[in-house]
Amino acid sequence: MKFIGLVGTNSKRSTNRQLLQYIQKHFADKADIELVEIKDFPVFNKPANKQLPENVLEVVKKIEEADGVIIGTPEYDHSIPAVLMNALAWVSYGVFPLLNKPVMITGASYGTLGASRAQLQLRQILNAPEIKANVLPDEFLLSHSLQAFDGNGDLVDLLGIQTMEVLHFHRQG
């Protein structure tokens, strides 16, 4: 199976990117997970010629060719980051790569709630008629993410690893 791991932030030191890298490594024997950055997308503005920027088209193609998408979102002020909203606007402008595409939402945050409010908002956005992704019912919340990884980038929380395993197998069933 092939998945796209969409890094939903432009932060250089993101624990959401770390989480996606861990998922990529942890499930390497079960799936090919390619991490995709959105930080270089231009600010969305409906282009007069209706042409998408080349870097957006590349991501659209990767999503279309994937069996599913895993989106890692941080939470800023109870919301998804502007860069993620910007990317979703681009990949739903006249193209529909996420239409009925299975999407799993993950989120890491420094605090206790693990990006739960951003994940709720992201779920609503992904259900919009212009996107209409098949958002999976489960989501993975990683709280206290600054302390969640060891020096090798592995999760140190056994419960978090077990939860991720359960979600993975639930998704496969």
Label for each model-derived stretch:
Residues 101-144:
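Short, glycine-/small-residue-rich phosphate/pyrophosphate-handling segment
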